[in-house]
Each structure stands twice: as C-alpha cells, then as structure tokens.
C-alpha cells in the first residue's frame, strides 16, 4: 500500500504513526502538500491519503476537489470522533482519503489502518 500524507498540521506525526502501525505492509509513505497528495491519489501513484488540520475536514479540501467527495471521509472534528464502526464502514465503502484533527491522530489512525489491512 502506498500512502500520501497531506493536511496542514502534524504531517510527520501521521507518517511516524503510520510507519509504526503498518510497518512493512506499506510500500511507501510520502509527506506532500495537499494538492500534490491529492493528485498522487487521483493518478494512482498512491492508494490512500491521510491528513490532519484543526477542523478535520479542511485537511480534505483539495482531496475533495480533485478526487471527489465520494472518496473522502472526515473521521474526526473538534469534539467528535466517529465510532470505530463508522470509520470501518468508510474504508469498506471504498473511501481513500481521510481527514481528522491533529489531536485525534492516535485514536483514528489505528482504526483506519486495521480496516485497510483487513479489507
């Protein structure tokens, strides 16, 4: 699996968390700007996009514009994290771009990764 990291904040923390949790199941984890990351996803150079910002949804602005809303899911926003079952349902529905708040990285990435690698 090839992952790109976009969003406005905590890019290195997302990448480090992903490396720790997914290990050798990933062939690449690349930190990029939002537009480049979304373009990599659309062109098939990446399989998944992860990004954080202060609102959760803002990390997906370029992904929504470039790959479409039907491929994107806001996993957390201030004061609200989706239930694990909801996150898993988004992965199983074929969503490939996920946005969340920086403070929720440790709560949401394990669920996303587990769902990706078990689907």
Where does each model-flagged region fall?
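C-terminal binding/interaction regions
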Residues: 2-6, 11, 78-119
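A short, gly/pro- and small-residue-rich
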Residues: 61-78, 113-119
């Amino acid at each position: 699996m090839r992952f790109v990291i976009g969003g406005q904040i905590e890019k290195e923390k997302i990448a480090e968390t992903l490396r720790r949790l997914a290990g050798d199941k990933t062939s690449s984890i690349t930190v990029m700007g939002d537009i480049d990351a979304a373009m990599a996803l659309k062109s098939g150079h990446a399989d998944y996009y992860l990004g954080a910002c202060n609102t959760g949804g803002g990390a997906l602005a370029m992904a929504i514009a470039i790959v479409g809303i039907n491929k994107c899911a806001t996993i957390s926003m201030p004061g609200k994290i989706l239930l694990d079952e909801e996150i898993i349902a988004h992965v199983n529905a074929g969503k490939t771009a996920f946005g969340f708040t920086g403070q929720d990285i440790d709560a949401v990435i394990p669920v996303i990764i587990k769902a990706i690698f078990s689907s």
